Structure formats: structure tokens, C-alpha cells
């Protein structure tokens, strides 16, 4: 099942994000095809990274939450909020080539 991970950074935490970025990218990449979409949320002016959106395949909501807690960004205390929910891919899903 797919889950969306919508994470917003704490205000003023750009340094934490940059310090942990390489480890975060390595962590996400290590899950291979289970990660369907991933990228930063941007500030209103589009100039700074302000959070993360990931769509990831997990066995359950509990597994999604556990995976999210292992993210180096989460472990470093970057996020002000994290919202993880089941997600259904309707438009543009490459696995639904009907």
C-alpha cells in the first residue's frame, strides 16, 4: 500500500536540513522502488527547502511510521510536523498503464 509522508521543517532549521541532507538522500535511495516520489517542499517564494513529501510503499501504517522515524532528518529533529496517510495514485501512475 502507498503512503504519503508530508513533513514540514521547524522554522529556522535550514542548517539541520543541510547537515543531514546527504544521509537523508542515501536513506531514501536505499529503499529503491518502494519510494515512488520524493522531493522537498519549498518556501512560499520557492527559494528554500521547507519540508519533504514522499510517496512510499509500506506494508502498513505502523510500518510507514517506523520507516519515517528512521529518516536521518527525523532523527536530527528537523521536522515540526509529520503527517503520514494511506495514499492512492490515480493520475500518472506508471504501474496502471491501462
Language-model regions: role of each:
Residues 1-98:
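Conserved, structured core segments of small domains
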Amino acid at each position: 500500500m502507498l503512503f504519503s509522508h508530508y513533513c514540514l521543517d521547524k522554522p529556522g532549521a535550514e542548517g539541520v536540513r543541510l547537515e543531514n541532507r546527504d544521509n537523508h538522500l542515501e536513506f531514501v535511495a536505499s529503499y529503491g522502488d518502494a519510494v515512488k516520489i520524493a522531493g522537498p517542499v519549498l518556501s512560499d517564494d520557492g527559494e528554500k527547502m521547507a519540508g519533504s513529501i514522499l510517496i512510499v510503499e509500506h506494508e502498513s501504517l505502523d510500518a510507514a511510521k517506523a520507516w519515517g522515524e528512521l529518516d536521518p532528518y527525523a532523527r536530527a529533529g528537523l521536522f515540526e510536523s509529520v503527517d503520514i496517510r494511506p495514499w492512492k495514485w490515480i493520475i500518472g501512475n506508471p504501474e496502471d498503464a491501462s
